[in-house]
């Protein structure tokens, strides 16, 4: 786990718990996404990493965000600025999104295939994964011709490698031993 994730997690958890309590998870996600995009701006990055007083930084950041942040969202920005943590806002969004997915019983599957998958293949893979994990699964597909054929599925810490490349690698290892 990266240091940024370790720093971001408590902020995301606090915001998420509050959002669940207020029944406002989607609006909080929107606020955090907007604030994270603002924090990625080059000019804003320079200000975040400058020697500006935390109170001034929070006030400036909240002014830039304007009405996109409610009072509680502005309070989160203020606390993060006071602790010198505004630079981890994108990681806070990632952690918040993961908590939301857990609440919604959703998983994201990273599918890497040697060739483009047809819609029928995607549906079949999605249904199989949903049956296995008992959750709604969103597919994120990408191509990697180096797999030769087959695919690799990553969900959280689980990896299902059904690629020709890995089978050839295992065969080569078996022949060498």
UniProtKB/Swiss-Prot annotation:
UniProt topology in membrane: Peripheral membrane protein
UniProt GO cellular component terms: plasma membrane; proton-transporting ATP synthase complex
Broad class of the protein's primary localization: membrane
GO MF, one annotated term: proton-transporting ATP synthase activity, rotational mechanism
Name of a matching Pfam family: OSCP
SUPFAM superfamilies associated with the record: N-terminal domain of the delta subunit of the F1F0-ATP synthase
Localization, UniProt: Cell inner membrane
Domain of life: Bacteria
Chaperone in keyword set: no
Keywords: ATP synthesis, Cell inner membrane, Cell membrane, CF(1), Hydrogen ion transport, Ion transport, Membrane, Transport
Disulphide-bonded residues: none
InterPro entries: ATP_synth_OSCP/delta_N_sf, ATPase_OSCP/d_CS, ATPase_OSCP/dsu
Record-linked Gene3D superfamilies: N-terminal domain of the delta subunit of the F1F0-ATP synthase
Function: F(1)F(0) ATP synthase produces ATP from ADP in the presence of a proton or sodium gradient. F-type ATPases consist of two structural domains, F(1) containing the extramembraneous catalytic core and F(0) containing the membrane proton channel, linked together by a central stalk and a peripheral stalk. During catalysis, ATP synthesis in the catalytic domain of F(1) is coupled via a rotary mechanism of the central stalk subunits to proton translocation. This protein is part of the stalk that links CF(0) to CF(1). It either transmits conformational changes from CF(0) to CF(1) or is implicated in proton conduction.
HAMAP family: ATP_synth_delta_bact (MF_01416)
Subunit-structure text: F-type ATPases have 2 components, F(1) - the catalytic core - and F(0) - the membrane proton channel. F(1) has five subunits: alpha(3), beta(3), gamma(1), delta(1), epsilon(1). F(0) has three main subunits: a(1), b(2) and c(10-14). The alpha and beta chains form an alternating ring which encloses part of the gamma chain. F(1) is attached to F(0) by a central stalk formed by the gamma and epsilon chains, while a peripheral stalk is formed by the delta and b chains.
NCBIfam families: ATP_synt_delta, PRK05758.2-2, PRK05758.2-5
Sequence similarity: Belongs to the ATPase delta chain family.
UniProt-recorded name of the protein: ATP synthase subunit delta
